[in-house]
């Protein structure tokens, strides 16, 4: 496998897994309260990574504060927001807002570095988010609450901070040791409310399997792959895995839930994939003179390229 192919796999596979996560969360909510879903997926994720010997590789003592931050900002806090949010907003809007994840990651990276991303990357982010919006339009309704939207936005801001923290930690220690410890921190933080909810849940086979898949896949494997991608190619490029989430959710909605898909949704899915390709390879747009655009932004905002 070439380096470029491996990098694409690091982006596509988490998107495929997370695209199915909303189905697993919805199934889990049939058996347990939202805080129980959060604790269950995090605890299963921690146990999954415990099976890997590399998880126990020592990490620098100075990095423990950052790892704890990842446990809070990447895991405990945002994963607590989504189950509550899904009770107040439509799946279409949830998918659209998740498509904005790379924008939040890029914004946080720009604030930390005092530097805007390259023009081609900015264009790709805009295209990808535009695709997510187009996909969601047919499913938007007036039933979405401001409270649910705020929960999702807070989760995305948290992701934006966490991915930028995780990159240097992964480069120094490796993704599995960092995420295993971060999941341990998140398990401890979510246990006081989550464990009683799990113990008092009305479990049947379907939600139990859903939580196992959500924890092992979406909370362990996908997070490790994304942390690896952040270390290899930067937080902003790693975050474009989010552009695949609404595409996968659309496909699963048709196959599993037999939902009707509009032409507009299919167009949006194609736009999402184009945006991901542009961010991964900004040279696709070299003929559009993004450097000149960057110079204008530099003069007007005080950032540098």
Predicted regions and their residues:
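Transmembrane alpha-helical segments that form core, pore/gating elements
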Residues: 46-49, 105-107, 111, 125, ...
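Hydrophobic transmembrane alpha-helices of multi-pass small-molecule transport proteins
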Residues: 43, 49, 68, 108, ...
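Juxtamembrane helix-entry segments on the extracytoplasmic side of multipass membrane proteins
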Residues: 3-8, 30-39, 59-65, 137-158, ...
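Transmembrane alpha-helices of multi-pass small-molecule transport proteins
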Residues: 30-77, 102-109, 157-165, 179-198, ...
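Hydrophobic/aromatic residues within transmembrane alpha-helices
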Residues: 28, 37, 41, 85, ...
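Specific transmembrane alpha-helical segments of multi-pass solute transporters/efflux pumps
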Residues: 17-25, 50-98, 134, 215-233
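Helix-helix packing/entry segments at the starts of transmembrane helices
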Residues: 39-40, 75, 94-100, 163-187, ...
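C-terminal-most transmembrane helix of multi-pass membrane proteins
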Residues: 1, 41-42, 137-138, 207, ...
């Amino acid at each position: 496998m070439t380096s470029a192919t491996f990098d694409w796999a690091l982006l596509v596979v988490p998107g495929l897994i997370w695209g199915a996560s909303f189905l697993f969360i919805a199934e889990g909510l049939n058996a347990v309260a939202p805080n129980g879903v959060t604790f269950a997926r995090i605890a299963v994720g921690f146990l999954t990574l415990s099976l890997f010997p590399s998880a126990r590789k020592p990490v620098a003592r100075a990095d423990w504060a950052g790892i704890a931050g990842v446990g809070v900002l990447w895991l405990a806090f945002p994963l607590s927001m989504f189950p509550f949010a899904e009770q107040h907003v439509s799946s279409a809007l949830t998918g659209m807002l998740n498509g904005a994840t790379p924008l939040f990651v890029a914004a946080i990276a720009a604030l930390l570095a005092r530097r805007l991303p390259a023009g081609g990357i900015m264009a790709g982010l805009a295209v990808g988010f535009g695709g997510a919006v187009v996909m969601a339009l047919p499913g938007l309704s007036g039933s979405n609450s401001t409270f649910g939207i705020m929960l999702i936005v807070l989760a995305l801001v948290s992701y934006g901070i966490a991915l930028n923290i995780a990159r240097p930690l992964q480069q120094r220690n490796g993704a599995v040791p960092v995420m295993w410890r971060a999941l341990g921190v998140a398990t401890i933080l979510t246990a006081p409310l989550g464990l009683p909810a799990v113990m008092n849940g009305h479990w049947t086979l379907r939600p139990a399997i859903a939580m196992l898949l959500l924890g092992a896949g979406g909370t362990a494997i996908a997070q490790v792959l994304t942390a690896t991608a952040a270390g290899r190619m930067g937080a902003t490029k790693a975050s474009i895995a989010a552009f695949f989430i609404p595409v996968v959710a659309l496909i699963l909605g048709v196959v599993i839930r037999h939902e009707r898909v509009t032409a507009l949704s299919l167009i949006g899915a194609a736009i999402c994939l184009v945006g991901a390709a542009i961010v991964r390879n900004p040279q696709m747009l070299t003929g559009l003179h993004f450097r000149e655009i960057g110079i204008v932004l530099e003069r007007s905002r005080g950032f540098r390229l």
